[in-house]
């Protein structure tokens, strides 16, 4: 699909969805998986927030922050992948609150026993379950969707079984075939399904920036 047509398709053909919870993103949090689905980093890059429906949610992410070393040197600290589950049934906004991470000692403590909080719009703590996502794959590139699915099937602390099977059939990301003028090849269908899903979750400003970028791309 040509980029211009894709932008028009996203802007005009997506169904209107009513969301009730805003997840405020942090530049120190690298979001990897949301509710069992791999995050589209290209679409959400620079986004300040994404919109969620009320109900249970699960995030897989890493904390990334520059820390100080002896001798006034610095390095980028990247935490192990973390899983956090929570419920937004009566919550309109979710904000990350990270602990102090300024040096190697604090980073080591966080690696061993990660702790952080999610706050609502009134800065009140949201009940959460937090865990480390143990990676079972030996591949150089980790498929966090698969690792999250395995985690959710293992009855761990932050597991949400309802998200364990959602990636088995990506057709659930596409509400109806009638939304498309024609049915594209399967590989293209999967790509569009994922793009539509993350476009719908992005905040209005991010959608606007993405459409501007898409219009500037040369036809494929």
UniProtKB/Swiss-Prot annotation:
UniProt KW keywords: Signal
Chain ranges passing through the membrane: none
Cleaved signal peptide residues: 1-20
Family: Belongs to the UPF0319 family.
NCBIfam families xref list: CrliSynInhib (NF047712), PRK03641.1 (NF002967)
The protein's name: UPF0319 protein YccT
Gene assigned in the entry: yccT
């Amino acid at each position: 699909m040509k980029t211009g047509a894709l932008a028009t398709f996203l802007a005009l053909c997506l169904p209107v969805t009513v969301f009730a919870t805003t997840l405020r993103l942090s530049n120190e949090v690298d979001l990897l998986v949301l509710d069992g689905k791999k995050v589209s980093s290209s679409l959400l890059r620079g986004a300040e927030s994404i919109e969620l429906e009320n109900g249970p949610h699960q995030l897989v992410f890493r904390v990334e922050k520059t820390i100080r070393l002896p001798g006034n040197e610095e390095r980028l600290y990247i935490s192990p992948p973390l899983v956090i589950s929570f419920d937004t049934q009566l919550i309109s906004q979710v904000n990350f609150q990270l602990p102090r991470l300024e040096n190697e000692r604090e980073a080591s403590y966080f690696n061993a026993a990660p702790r952080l909080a999610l706050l609502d719009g009134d800065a009140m703590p949201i009940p959460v379950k937090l865990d480390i996502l143990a990676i079972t794959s030996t591949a150089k590139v980790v498929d966090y969707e698969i690792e999250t699915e395995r985690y959710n099937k293992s009855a761990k602390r932050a597991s949400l079984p309802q998200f364990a099977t959602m990636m088995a059939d990506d057709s659930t990301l596409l509400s109806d075939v009638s939304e498309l003028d024609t049915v594209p090849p399967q590989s293209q269908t999967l790509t569009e399904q994922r793009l539509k899903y993350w476009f719908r979750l992005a905040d209005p400003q991010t959608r606007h920036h993405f459409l501007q970028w898409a219009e500037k791309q040369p036809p494929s």
